[in-house]
Swiss-Prot record:
Entry keywords, A to Z: Amino-acid biosynthesis, Aromatic amino acid biosynthesis, Decarboxylase, Lyase, Tryptophan biosynthesis
Provenance organism: Neisseria meningitidis serogroup B (strain ATCC BAA-335 / MC58)
NCBIfam families the record matches: PRK00278.1-6, PRK00278.2-4
Protein family according to the UniProt entry: Belongs to the TrpC family.
Gene this protein is translated from: trpC
Identification of the protein by name: Indole-3-glycerol phosphate synthase
Highest taxon of source: Bacteria
EC number: 4.1.1.48
Gene3D superfamilies with a match to the protein in the record: Aldolase class I (3.20.20.70)
Length: 260
């Protein structure tokens, strides 16, 4: 595990402890059960594929540790509508505040503005956060293999599935495959950003493709132009999680159109 990831996870542990003190586990479960019905994240992706279209998971992200502030003029509902108009399959919304300037309010605002399913993009380290995601209205959660042990991955996935949510499992390299072997989610993402160097290479996705046969593979990070999209499609990857490229655009809807 890298220094930056260790730092983020340590902060997250403190954050979750404070959240549990404010809203106990029993109450967050009740809120999750009372949340608006789930929109199927995986079905939305498969719907695009059935039409022979790429499935875009369009990200709403204000900032990141590596790039700092990405989009000063940040209006989640407006961004969500632009993504929906452009034909995105799903949304991804950052809810981590210390490192990504995210917020649960951004997730709620985005989801209320559109009919698309929404992923809570955060560092999940406790099953409490899975219930919390559903309580906030999320339809899917991200589980990062590098941040979790096998038992945690399996337990958090089970909770998410019990709540009707889709799990996007995120891998960085082949060393993480073994602890994920029992997971049943069909949606496996590969983050092209090296956690140690922060360098980005689409080879990360390509190197893992043989091991992910039969999965719906999502390529994450590093897609900056139409050539990248066409290259990944030529290799059999048809699902893309893209944030920064869209967030830096003056006209988000037009930028999505340029790539897809």
């Amino acid at each position: 595990m890298t220094d930056i990831l260790n730092k983020i996870l340590a902060t997250k542990a403190q954050e979750v402890a404070a959240q549990k003190a404010a809203v106990n586990a029993e109450h967050i479960r009740t809120l999750a059960a009372e949340a608006a019905p789930v929109r199927s994240f995986i079905d939305s992706i498969r719907g695009k594929h059935r039409l022979n279209l790429p499935a875009v998971i369009a990200e709403i992200k204000k900032a990141s540790p590596s790039k700092g502030l990405i989009r000063p003029d940040f209006r989640p509902a407006e961004i969500a509508r632009a993504y929906e108009n452009a034909g995105a399959a799903c949304l991804s919304v950052l809810t981590d505040e210390p490192y990504f300037q995210g917020s649960p309010e951004y997730l709620k605002q985005a989801r209320e503005a559109v009919s698309l399913p929404v992923l809570r993009k955060d560092f999940i380290i406790d099953e409490y956060q899975v219930y919390q995601a559903r309580a906030w209205g999320a339809d899917a959660v991200l589980l990062i293999a590098a941040a979790l042990e096998q038992e945690q991955l399996e337990r958090f996935e089970a909770v998410a599935h019990e709540l009707g949510m889709t799990v996007l499992l995120e891998l960085h390299d082949e060393t993480e495959l073994e602890k994920c072997r029992n997971l049943t989610t069909p949606l496996w993402g590969v983050n092209n950003r090296n956690l140690r160097t922060f360098e980005v290479s689409l080879d990360q996705t390509l190197s893992l493709l043989p091991a992910l046969e039969g999965k719906t593979v999502v390529t994450e990070s590093g897609i900056t132009g139409k050539a990248d999209v066409e290259f990944m499609q030529s290799r059999g990857v048809h699902t893309f999680l893209i944030g920064e490229t869209f967030m830096r655009a003056d006209d988000i809807e037009a930028e999505v159109g340029k790539l897809f």
